[in-house]
């Protein structure tokens, strides 16, 4: 079985914590032009109270054509090289990492009120730490509405979560330290 059982992470709180800390998702989506997947990177915000991710993309992004389809959201956490020198040369080199994979259904948002709500949530969340915080209301409503016409607003409803946390769980305590 791959990944090995000791690297699999099933604790939903840990999976959600990684997604919140590293919100840039690589999204694999079906491509109507071929059997290949299209891939795009999109920052998303997970709303745990509703169990949905929210995001927006350019109107011409292929993801905007995936309404009612299933996609994969891939999140990568911290990663690093593990040198054998950390274990007195008793192990082979390795790479430590954590990742989360979410299968989700796509819902393209059509309501202007919902689009504005999503933009407000995204900007207020991602503007944290900036002083002063920029607000979408700094843009006149007519300009916002014109900009929204160039975007597709999306909700992703998760149907399956899985994680792969390869953090030397199979190594001795000395190597893990």
Could you describe each region identified by the protein language model?
Residues 1-26:
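Short, basic/aromatic recognition patches
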Residues 16-18, 63-65, 144-149:
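A general structural signal for short secondary-structure junctions and capping/turn motifs
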Residues 22-59:
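Short beta-strand segments
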Residues 23, 40, 49-53, 67-71, ...:
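A generic structural signal for short beta-strands and their flanking turns/coil linkers
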Residues 33, 104, 154-156:
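A residue-level signal for conserved active-site and pocket-lining positions in enzyme catalytic cores
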Residues 36, 94-98, 148:
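A generic structural micro-feature
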Residues 59-118:
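Short, structured beta-strand-loop surface elements
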Residues 109-177:
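C-terminal edge-of-domain segments
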